[in-house]
Amino acid sequence: MARKVKIPNHIQKRLARDAHKRKRNTKSKRKYFLIVCEGEKTEPNYFESLKNDLPKGVLTSCRIDVEGTGRNTLSLVEESIKMKERLENETSLSIDKIWVVFDRDSFEPDNFNEAINLCKNSLPEIGCAWTNEAFELWYLLHFHFYNTAINREMYQKLIEGNLKPKVGEDYEYQKNSKEMYDLLKENGSLELAIRFATKLEAEFEGRFDFANHNPSTKVHHLVAELFGLEELLKKEDEDKASG
């Protein structure tokens, strides 16, 4: 069953501004979103499951492609730009928004920061759902607030610690599992994850040394945008009817 997710006000306002920009000089058409992930399975599996959980009608009005590349940081952003051009040529459709999803992991700070700045400076801007240090931080925020830097192995142990009491003591975290979105939906809280990610973001407000924002994630902006599409589409329909 499709779900409703409460979107924080500051994200709703940003989405409304973006929708207003897109509306100008734009004919009515099916919107096209491209999500390009660093991982070939972990992140694509999560977002494919999330996509199927969006409110009824969103996928009728929006095409959402999720691609896993095996690339990282700067090379991922560069590949997403090439992928957009290639898909637009192949489909004769215009992609409205690109999002890239990648982790800090052990990559060079300069490459990580440069990738984020390239997204910000692109025209149109590329959405950047980065996480420092690993995507699994987003999973953990469905249960508790974490603001201490930890390694990937500890993420795995904490995920298992949060899920074992709910699904059974024999549970073992599988990095590329197709069930992760559903496990989090049934046993955690997406609204809590968005709230905690926003709280982490505020701890680094005004700082642009992104490689040192540990722990932190921007995944909630992408998730909120996807779940906010239903209201934005309704608003655009109302604007067309009144205009």
Explain the meaning of each model-derived region.
Residues 1-32, 42-44, 48-67, 85-99, ...:
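C-terminal accessory helical subdomains adjacent to catalytic cores in phosphodiester-
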Residues 34-38:
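Short hydrophobic beta-strand that contains or immediately precedes a catalytic carboxylate
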